[in-house]
Amino acid sequence: MILGIGLFFNACEKPKETLETTQEQATLENLNILMNNGEKLIINQRNTQDKNHNFKNIEPKKANVLQDLLVTSDKKNIKLLFFFTTWCEPCVAILSHLENLQKQFGDEIGIYGIAIDDLVGETENFQESVEVFIQENQYFLPLAYGKNREELFSALGGIDGIPLIVLYDEKGEYIIHYLGAIPEEMMEFDLSQSVAKMRTK
């Protein structure tokens, strides 16, 4: 139990100036995020006054920004965005949980990794670091570490910690997100509910 509580709040943090973008935040419109397996996410951003946000262990302001995104692809499934860096131990620790969830739910969910080392100041040998990360951790899920990530990072106003996991439904609507190495059971519960709703539509 104590270990579980520790993992819930365990997240990699960097100084505020490296995690937060200093660029002017522009509204995203049809931003294409290309994955290393050829899959593509299309991200749009909208302004909303809706205050009924659903977030866990993260400040409301960030939840508002994430809820304003519409994340779609050519697949009608639940999408899980996994923001991470290659040096973050909690990020590595959560990989096995993500792989378990992908196997459990199959094509009804899509898990997309988004590496941000270079966006938080770790620019040296970024491509090589990602390739080593893939090999050492036998990472097989779709992964983005190319162009256009910076625009998404800027629209988010930076990221407060990692791993950051965000769920969107089959229509691209925000569901929920988590900060830190959270228990697999929590993600499984939320995914089960979302998949069940998707099946009834």
Place the predicted regions along the sequence by residue.
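Short, internal strand/loop/helix patches
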Residues: 128-164
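Thiol-based oxidoreductase modules, predominantly thioredoxin-like and allied folds used
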Residues: 109-125, 139-149
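Conserved helix-turn-beta segment immediately C-terminal to the redox Cys motif
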Residues: 77-78, 93-116, 135, 184
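N-terminal targeting signals for export/organelle localization
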Residues: 1-60, 200
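Thiol-/selenol-based redox modules, centered on thioredoxin-like
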Residues: 161, 167-201
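Conserved redox-active cysteine motifs that mediate thiol-disulfide chemistry
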Residues: 83-100, 121-122
